[in-house]
C-alpha cells in the first residue's frame, strides 16, 4: 500500500524477518547457500502474488486444444515459453467448475513441481517410483511425459491421500498410475526394480513459501 515500515530494532536479520515476514533461520540458510542479493530477490518475490500454473494433460489432448477450451470459458491463459505443457492461468476460485478441468485436460501444478517431473526424464514403457506422491501432481505429469505407457507406483503413508491420487488419475484418464499405501523409508522387496525414482519429500520445500507462507 506504499506505507513505510516503522523503525525496526535489531540487526539486519531481524529487520529482514519483519520486512519479509520470514523466520531468521530461513533467511540465514538462504544467505549461506545463495548469497545476499539472491536472498533479497527471493524474499521480495515471496511477497508477490504467485501465478496459478497448470499442467496440460498431453496424454489426452494438445496444449492448443486445452488453451482454446479455457479461453472459450473466459479464462486468460499464457503458455510458458520454457516448459512444455505448462500454462499460467488468471487467478480464479472456480477451477473445478471449468470444463477443461472436469474433462481431465489439465491439473493444477506449480511450475517448480512440473520441473521436478520434467527433470525425472521418464520415458514410455518405464517403471517409475514416486516415493512421496500425494497429492499426485508429479506422478500425473510423469505419466503424461510417458504417454501413459509403463507403470508409476505412487506411494504415500496416508490412506486419504492415496484416495486423492486415485481420484486425480481417474479424472485425467491415466491408467499407468498405481497408488499404494507405502512408507518410502521402509525397504519393501515386493516393490521390485524401477528405471527411475522420484523423491521430492519436502514438495519443493522453501521454494513454495510464497504460496504456502
Say what each PLM segment does.
Residues 1-213:
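S-adenosylmethionine
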Amino acid at each position: 500500500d506504499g506505507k513505510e515500515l516503522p523503525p525496526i530494532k535489531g540487526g539486519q536479520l531481524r529487520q529482514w524477518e519483519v520486512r519479509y515476514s520470514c523466520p531468521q533461520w530461513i533467511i540465514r540458510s538462504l544467505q549461506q547457500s545463495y548469497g545476499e542479493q539472491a536472498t533479497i530477490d527471493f524474499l521480495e518475490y515471496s511477497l508477490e502474488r504467485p501465478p496459478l500454473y497448470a499442467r496440460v494433460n498431453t496424454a489426452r489432448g494438445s496444449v492448443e486444444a486445452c488453451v482454446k477450451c479455457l479461453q472459450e470459458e473466459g479464462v486468460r491463459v499464457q503458455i510458458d515459453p520454457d516448459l512444455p505443457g505448462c500454462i499460467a492461468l488468471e487467478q480464479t476460485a472456480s477451477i473445478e467448475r471449468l470444463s477443461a478441468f472436469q474433462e481431465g485436460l489439465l491439473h493444477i501444478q506449480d511450475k517448480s513441481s512440473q520441473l521436478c517431473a520434467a527433470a525425472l526424464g521418464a520415458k514410455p514403457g518405464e517403471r517409475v517410483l514416486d516415493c512421496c506422491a500425494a497429492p499426485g501432481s508429479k506422478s500425473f505429469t510423469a505419466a503424461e511425459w510417458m504417454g501413459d505407457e509403463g507403470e508409476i507406483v505412487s506411494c504415500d503413508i496416508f490412506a486419504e491421500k492415496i484416495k486423492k491420487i486415485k481420484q486425480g488419475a481417474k479424472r485425467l484418464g491415466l491408467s499407468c498410475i498405481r497408488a499404494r499405501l507405502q512408507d518410502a523409508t521402509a525397504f519393501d522387496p515386493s516393490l521390485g526394480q524401477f528405471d527411475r525414482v522420484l523423491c521430492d519429500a519436502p514438495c519443493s520445500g522453501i521454494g513454495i513459501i510464497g504460496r504456502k507462507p
